[in-house]
């Protein structure tokens, strides 16, 4: 089920909130918890119930292994160490095997066939929604159990930790000690109207980012990549690149706002996952702002176990690049994602290597270079193949044709704005007289929003009449734009 859908907004969310708080009010906290788990199952299996057995099996196996890791065994210390390492290895093999089969099997076999001229059959496996997210979340719990850093939670608590629907399909990747204590806090079992208002505002803001901005830009991006082989001009390629840069920004930012807002409605504060990444002054800074919980997971469970920065300069750079290769592979089974991760690893390593020179540059130059790097690397993230990405970059660098065709410019129109100014003669005349003004105004406005406003999660929330009006306006605007419902980009990872 999608946050940006009528059934979620008008059916699922009211039912879930009403049943959860209603059961708590009746003094049935266990039933409230179980109901929230079952509603999360409905949310997950809405489009394809076949996904449910995968997630349920994963939850059961990981919970049992974690229980065994937490158990006080009556053995010698050496025997316990061997047993726990064996259990952890089984758990990691199970989880990585699950991801490999559903996400990477066809990719692996396809490349095997190409390299060795074999003819192994592809299975055309449908990727279960959010498998990378709920698997990584459970891996973190299992590793923490191995380290003795977890409490003994019952199965319902564990299932709720994994399935809580605001973060189930596209993150953030939460830790057990971030959410489970909040569910156990009795003060969170009754409606907090300040949190409800805060959550509704965040949800409404995220809905506009997704349904109005990101989905509009998705049409422009699809047009640009679709016309790459049909004499796409250099200026059209540049505008397409910028359109995707802002599409993925507002798509992911919108999702994070909506997920955070939904958490607030249940009195649960989920960790920040997005913090104005296009304000970054370096690639290192970018990854302190983009997908924060994935960065935290890779740092804690991949980078540090590899040795981090403790084994010399060369090993540090190798570890950094390895982590970003894992990040790229995590995002998708395609060489484009791996190469995207590799480029970010190189960028991160070079920034560290030339730290003094970088910091001696003016901040404006630091921002410009970082933003340009992020833009160019997003091309690999979006392209269907590395060859297509290089063809796209070649088209940008050609500067042979700076014309922009009218059908492409029309894709940048926000329908609501067009409807307004078309009924105001003066504005309509101005807009009609300046070719491409829709694209110019939209992209300039998005630059302004990204660079001059705080992230919604950073702002101190104060419920006021003005904010209530803004919330209602955003909610209505977003809902009326839901005629063409589309998935969030990160649902595919």
Features from the language model and the residues they span:
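Membrane-embedded transmembrane alpha-helical bundles that form the catalytic cores
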Residues: 1-448, 456-492
